Amino acid sequence: MNNQKLKYFKSPAEFFNLFLSLLLAMPLTRVTGFKKSIYPVFSEKIALAVSGVTNCAYCSWLHTKTSLEKGMREKEIKSLLDGDIKDIPEQEAPALFYVQHRADFDGGFSPKARQRIVDFYGEEKVGHIDFMFQAVYFGNLCSNTVYSGRYDMVQGRKDLKFRLVYFLSLPVAYFIRKGSK
């Protein structure tokens, strides 16, 4: 883990809002265009870009492993985790900048940034990119919440709100850690 501040859930409401938006977006993954627009290596690049911003140790490890399995080079993986997108293909760079922007804004985005990416990719593909972002970001926050709670990194971690969100995040963090082994 580097010295960046971990992003984690601060309340059960934040957890449930992101979880609900993820559930509502799930039907997008059944659309045939999803697999064409978000091919496996591109999805890993999105995951690495988001995990680099949230500084998630579990997810960085998992997505490094799966990226290597899908044929990505170590240098490219490290660059994405470090937030360096200069050597990314022109067709992928806007999406990766966009998901980094969203992770920096705690899942939000500026309307101008979203409009620029819609102009570049079209609304359907941006919907797919948004879904990928939400899935990865949710996993990152769950993992970081558990990590932060376990390693005494959160002031007020005995607070009822934090304890509740910690326990809500445990199953997701468990499956991410299990997947990275």
Which residues make up each language-model segment?
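Hydrophobic alpha-helical segments
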Residues: 1-181
